[in-house]
Amino acid sequence: MDDIYRKAMKAQVGELAEEMDELYQLVSTGQPVSRVIYRAVERNLQLLTEACIGIAKHSLKGMAKEVPSDARQAFAKLRQLGLDHSGADWNRIIGMRNALVHAYLNLDAERVLDVVRQRRYQVLLDFAAQRLNDAA
């Protein structure tokens, strides 16, 4: 993985981690969540997923492996190579990302908020940290 990309993504993922922790605090109070906070949750989940997709593809590229255009295939290839130990359900994660981008009017807001309330986004942060700190 290119050092410039790695450095930029570490900074980006670090910012997203801080923002997700702030959002966790805001949505876990038991109080109603404002539309602005909810939109921030949606956007940050989208950005974090996009970051992981980019990291997966750049990891493969850095190893001179063929990079699938489909994100699910990129994660599957990393798993086949023994380079994704996150346990993440990438099909569900990418499905949610697609819904956030393309079907946002039909989303169940409580399901989206539960991802944050239950800190299920942590698997994305863990994957990113593992891949960005790896030598490849």
Task: Describe every region a protein language model picked out.
Residues 1-136:
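Solvent-exposed interaction patches of small proteins and small membrane subunits
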